[in-house]
Amino acid sequence: VSVKAPSLYPLKPCSSENTASVTLGCLVKDYFPDPVTVTWYSDSLNTSTMNFPSIGSDLKTTTSQMTSWGKSAKNFTCHVTHAPSTFVSDLTIRARPVNITKPTVDLLHSSCDPNAFHSTIQLYCFVYGHIQNDVSIHWLMDDRKIYETHAQNVLIKEEGKLASTYSRLNITQQQWMSESTFTCKVTSQGENYWAHTRRCSDDEPRGVITYLIPPSPLDLYENGTPKLTCLVLDLESEENITVTWVRERKKSIGSASQRSTKHHNATTSITSILPVDAKDWIEGEGYQCRVDHPHFPKPIVRSITKAPGKRSAPEVYVFLPPEEEEKDKRTLTCLIQNFFPEDISVQWLQDSKLIPKSQHSTTTPLKYNGSNQRFFIFSRLEVTKALWTQTKQFTCRVIHEALREPRKLERTISKSLGNTSLRPSQASM
């Protein structure tokens, strides 16, 4: 048999008995030849180890065991060295604490009635009976951590060695209606506990999808024609479908335009567009789109208001075409980052003249990983080599509500000048 490195497997009890100790093992399997060296590391001083002789005539197998005394969860590392194959590896095994105090975790939410105009929904995570000063609470949306400053943790009471705490998280109606799963993750005594929730179940017809789209910054601040769009997808036909609009303050509402489109998959979509007053929208007025049909168990209702949260102005950078690009074209890239909310408009100009939207492309806003709630996008403009070499100037213009008046920020680039300065200031409101 030729030299072969081992495989490592953790060994731990199937259940946590109410004993004063816990025993873990490290299985070292399918290696040749002897010997292997197994060493244990842990943050516990009260431990004992035992290494067993190897077995097997060809491929070898051995085990090593560690016993620890104490009531806290600990991480134990099995360090294995097999000199003949130069194999060195660590296997970390987490021991479940004995006599653990399991807290109770309840996740509740405020009213999720889509007929309500409130722009936020509150999630409450109650943790009862945890060890004092030994609890952390984190929020996740579809298993991704949510920006921590949106959460508020409050100690409710202390009873002897135990305490109770709750954490509150505000989310938008749009996040709630997206059917995402929200999770409260609680860590206590080194153990994790989860509670989950998602939007209230309702009687909306299966298959029919409805989106409510806010005004674009371009229409809101540049064109002065802000509008809401209610998009209804996957209908059998437009027959007997009604789309109506309602304002939160019950004031008069303008006339909406509506069109239907038949698609190749034999479904129909309806687009209803409602002009709104820019001042009303900026001040936080709420709107609803209601879609109904005689066969629906109840109307489909979508609500929208201006997104809550701290505003952050975008940073804009334009990049020169790559030198190795094909000889008959040049690609300009505009990076827009660190902005909130996600609603943003991007335009390209050539020598101060607007380039048609069909000639450039922009990604949808992407959210940063981790705790940052801000967004970034890329916009791409492809031009001919002739235009680029003629020292034409190309400008990436960004429109966003967090920018100072007139809510625009530009970055200009050309072959002869390179990157020019920003205009106007990118300072936030």
UniProtKB/Swiss-Prot annotation:
From its record, what is one biological process in GO terms? Answer: peptide antigen assembly with MHC class II protein complex
Record has Membrane as a keyword:
yes
Which SMART domains does its entry note? IGc1 (SM00407)
Check the record and name the Gene3D superfamilies matching this protein: Immunoglobulins
- Disulfide pairs here are C26-C78, C125-C184, C230-C289, C334-C396
Keywords (alphabetical) are: Cell membrane, Disulfide bond, Immunoglobulin domain, Membrane, Repeat, Secreted
Task: Share what the entry says about its subunit structure, partners included.
Answer: The basic structural unit consists of two identical heavy chains and two identical light chains; disulfide-linked. N-terminal variable regions of the heavy and light chains form the antigen binding sites, whereas the C-terminal constant regions of the heavy chains interact with immune receptors to mediate effector functions.
Protein's UniProt name: Immunoglobulin heavy constant epsilon
Q: Which organism's genome codes for this protein?
A: Rattus norvegicus (Rat)
